[in-house]
Amino acid sequence: MDQQEAPIYYGRSVNKVYNQEFIIDSRFKIVKELGHGAYGIVCSAKYDNGSKKVPDSNNGNASSSANASFVAIKKITNIFSKNILCKRALRELKLLQFFRGHKNITCLYDLDIIPNPMTGEFNEIYLYEELMECDMHQIIRSGQPLSDQHYQSFIYQVLCGLNFIHSADVLHRDLKPGNLLVNADCELKICDFGLARGFSENPDENAGFMTEYVATRWYRAPEIMLSFTNYTKAIDIWSVGCILAELLGGKPLFRGKDYVDQLNQILMILGTPPESTLQRIGSHRAQNYVRSLPITRKASYEELFPDANPLALDLLERMLTLDPRERITVRDALNHKYLELWHDPKEEIECQVKFDFKSFETVDGLDEMKQLIMDEVQKFREFVRKPIEEQQRIQMQLHMQKREEQRQEEEEKELLEQQRQFPAQESMDISQTPYNNLETNIGTPQVEDDYPRPQELDEFTFSNLESSSSMNLFQDMAKPSGEEYIKLEEELGFGLDWCYV
């Protein structure tokens, strides 16, 4: 298509990438295609408006730059063809904005939607993100030699990003080498939040958020497949353990051909779980299957990874436990002796507010989600075109407002709980309750350094449990038939989407 037709797309240039139209801000030129898949296309692009000057504020002024600036532009396609794709896109937009500024989470620079000039409709979104040189999967697959300090640095950075994510009560749920972006200086950033979900200490509030779980099988926590009675932030720690094992061994540790084979490979390494763990499996078919298998002893990590640092194996042992209750937390992992060379409290910051999933996860209509996406794009485009100082001020105000709302919500919950426990006191004057005089620092403003700021874009900016039957009932059980195997595979593949007790 002739570039002269670009004005019908509101000043954007039209490119052909993988035989699809790739319509981007005319100030950018496509450098090369980075990849494509079921959900879209990614290209690298260079900022170039002819003068090789990058605008640094919303007044259109420009500043000289020795090197042109590069970005990764991701086109998410067919977002309104299915509810699940639309919700995934909305989740990605909101979370990338929410976590924007943390050094170990990919930075979102801009958003764009391209309406059809005739109908005004759109079915795709463009995300402008910081460009990284490769991902962890490519590094491991290349076979290039890495030192133990490389492993330490990579895992430490993953945990720093995950600590920030978990502190906002968010589960990533799709951590894998392909979702860890890396630069030549070994800087690492977590990407792809399309499968993320909220987390609550109240299990009843988590039950509805485990649908549409299709994370990569090799890095999926066993409690998801086995339908444990609850799921926690430990599911992400399992994935980090799988990544550490892959770094140490140069290949994935659990490479199941299907979900039943995946479970078999996990049990071959971790051994037969104790009865107390089996009883927490929500899927009775999975319980019966595990009990039908021969008793297996736990494998030795020293034999699996003979050249590995013993401290790395100790951390791996604590990450890869079948029972999620025994798995190390992200905070304890950061303090593990294996990572002490990199340990820096200033790098291990926590998010000061909780992410609000309820505002959109309960929305299922395509029209409603479409409007939410349009609103998100418009608000973010306006935000990133403000001067950096104003962005920081707005972000600080939003954080403080959200923290105050969450403080009030927690007070209301505590008051309701007190009234439930002491119904005779329900009629007491609210002014006499102890909560009015409760001292708290939840709403106290923190110093500015506690908040990750919008990144100073030096290179470019867009500014212008039920108990199971006893074990002896199953010890003589035969292996499942072909039909039972298929049913088990279906159940393990759906995990908590299928069975939640």
UniProtKB/Swiss-Prot annotation:
The modification Phosphothreonine is found at residue 211. One of its GO terms (cellular component) is cytoplasm. PROSITE patterns: MAPK (PS01351), PROTEIN_KINASE_DOM (PS50011), PROTEIN_KINASE_ST (PS00108). CDD domains: STKc_MPK1. The active site is at residue 174. One of its GO terms (molecular function) is ATP binding. Residues 400-450 are annotated as: Disordered. This is Mitogen-activated protein kinase MKC1. It comes from Candida albicans (Yeast).
